[in-house]
Amino acid sequence: MLFRSAIMGPNSRELLQSLTDTDLSNENLPFTSVCNLEIGMATVRAHRITYVGELGWELYFPIEFSNYIAELIESIGEKFSLKLCGMHSVDSCRIEKAYRHFGHDITDEDHVLDAGLGFVVKPDKKPSKYGKFIGYDAVRKKQANGCEKRVMQFLLINPDVMLYHNEPILRNGEIIGYLSSGAYGHTLGGAVGLGYIDCEPGESEIGRASCRERG
């Protein structure tokens, strides 16, 4: 059984580099790359990706090494300003970055282009030996016809109001969509939400929109 941990933030490379001889530079390990690291007595699978929009790595290793690696990281953490964080901290950072949450912001019923994730599909790329990717025709059709809804990110001006999900999104007093997720953006100083809005195919600007406050 594997245990997963993560080191995230601007000092994450320096901290992790102090624990291994593997070169963690951007040139050697670019974004999304994976490698095995020797950290003390453990072999760790390191994936250079995070859910917070910052430099960082997700670490996978046998669960019997979980306490050992946690204590090893904690023993050197102070000089790198290491702090423990929980899921609410991660959720706050990811929504500021507009990272979608599967199950709230995207599901298997949403179109990749409506979700603003067109960069992850390459319809112009030469097909592999297995043929075109699943959903190729749907992407081409949407590209030709345009999106009728799209994900947008919202920041509340009032810093005292929270967003959760399902709040209506209004433009000129009319509901044009609902928030799919929300959290407080501590770096931005206000609640942040992601939500789908209705739009005309080819429409690129929505003007000023707002989220209706609860209560």
Task: Write out the residue ranges for each language-model feature.
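Conserved, structured C-terminal
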Residues: 3-212
